[in-house]
Amino acid sequence: MGSLKTYYTGLISWDWSLYPLAPYKGKGWIINFEKSPVILRSGLVNYGNKTKKQKEVIINACNYSSAQNALEMINSAYMLISAEPSFAEVEFVIPKDKEELIKLFPYELSRPHRCTMGTSHFPLACMIAAKASFKRSHKYALAKFRFASKLHSIFRVDIDPSHATDHLGISPFIENHIRFAYSIVAAYSAIEEIGLEIRASVNSPSMIDGKWNPKVKNDIEERLRRVGIDSNETFPWDLRGKPTRIEKSKQLPSRGRCDWARGPYVRDCELEMIDAIRIASFLRSKISSHKMNPLVTSLTSYDVENVRMLARRLLLGALGFWPPPWYERNKKR
């Protein structure tokens, strides 16, 4: 890599000691966790009977652009594992070298403190970013997932069946229709980046007389198998409230209700993985992209979350990080 410069990220890790020890090596950069001059108060965190110092994510890279790209990938990876909108992000790396700092960010010298963000699981985000950095399709898939999430995403509590409400239904606002649609487009594009989209055509459609075209089915099952995803795995598909016009237009090949589905409002069902990808493809190609389909007014946050969380599941699987370490292996999301 040649000589490397040091860049501060402002990302403060509370749980660095619970993950494999750094360094984490990406393509053209290296991540370490070091004591930071910006950590205020005691900087101590208790885990069980152990007390550990918080540490900052430090990027060593050959230049600013490389370090900044690494930070962007860490932010994308963190959004991938959290599955939620970000309260805030640290947007820029800060050079340790004073001359480079003055050249890039002269105002930083007059600030009493750098921007920081402290939370858990930054080491996991760094590990994901490092692995993804070696493959262009993985880098762009991460970026597209983050872009989709910024366009529209919701907190898990808002989709938790025990907190089910009707406030995430159909929106009367055109801006929301566009936001929902293009979040779906971006999320499905992340699936395309990792090569797990449905590959069908006019001459070789995905379905023939209501059944899978064996050629198309075998193809997607093989591509899933190559990245370590079982095509027989089911994926929970959120269905809330009365069926929308979109739901009525495309019958879902349900494998049965989810364990938590109760009553007429929470109708979540299990789909085979390949069927979930096919329905996501339908939402992308027939509803959300190109000229707006009249059915776009029936898109809801649940449609967006279904495609976004499917992209998350497939991307984490393709990168070798499914399930996240704090989930039970039988959890889907």
Language-model segments: which ranges?
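Charged, non-catalytic interaction/linker regions at domain boundaries
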Residues: 1-182, 301-305, 309, 313-333
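Amphipathic, oligomerization/interface secondary-structure segments
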Residues: 129-333
